[in-house]
């Protein structure tokens, strides 16, 4: 593994060091404090063999939209970072503006073998033969479940081929009044109104929020199969009572995790970022967890979304060779292994994933890999105006779960609203 990294580093050479100049490369990402320390570990070997290069992280530790705006502002001002983290949702906007470099012509010289990457993840950052970012890591959305609650109820752990009927039956059995006060205090699942979470459930039911070309919602968001999927998903709250009412919950990002790690919710939709948060509970013997693919409607193929990030280079990079070399290093085997061990994401390199699975005694990584096999690129990686669409979609579920609207009527109204956002005509 280290030999491959070293080979990658010497291809471009150390021109800056040979000239006696110390070059500073700016690396922009959304890392928080702990993630930034992890990236420092990743960068250590690179800096060691590049004495003439200094890498400075620009850590914004912010949400995706503000990060993108800061990135676009720096590019418009002519002072972009040398390398930057590119999330799948930002790709369409940056490509359409022509501000991100197509790396494809440089990959051979940079010793990057894209055949070693997960091809679904690679496709997220590709347009035809163009490659606009080297994928760093990714996660499919899956279901995490509390094994202790399953064991107490005598319920076998779910398998990847489970259906919506299986899920509903299990969730009902795990929804309980545990203290006999007449109030439910343990729920089978958790209802999440965020589109990036619930859209994979709609896919697993055979529906979709946009039509295949991504240009309109009409005829797809309000198609019978999608309406049925939305009715089933919102029914967790409106009819089945297997999820806590969202308006009774605190509006905190950590709400869902607290409900789950306190044993009040048995199953949740989540991604790989929960792995490092759950490990301490398992290590301390406090709780046991499992991961499994999102269940599907009987007769419909399983499906989920794959969310990914990569490292890209600005089209007007001042130090193009060094920038491409750094991006290649940050997505190579050693870097992927370090991040994979930290648990924040699955590595994009298939060999790194295989090593991660082989060393995982809990079986968590294998579950994520199996889910990846039925994953697809999210809409945010395909259409530029997805942020605007995503901003209005939660209202669809709110109208059904809080205002009592009919799912069909609400979906029809939302399809018209989304079409206006996209500029489509009905």
What are these regions (language model features)?
Residues 104-117, 160, 179-188, 207-229, ...:
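Short, solvent-exposed loop/beta-turn-alpha elements that line the ligand-binding surface or hinge
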Residues 80-82, 111-149, 186-188, 295, ...:
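A structural signal for short loop-to-beta-strand junctions that line the ligand-binding cleft
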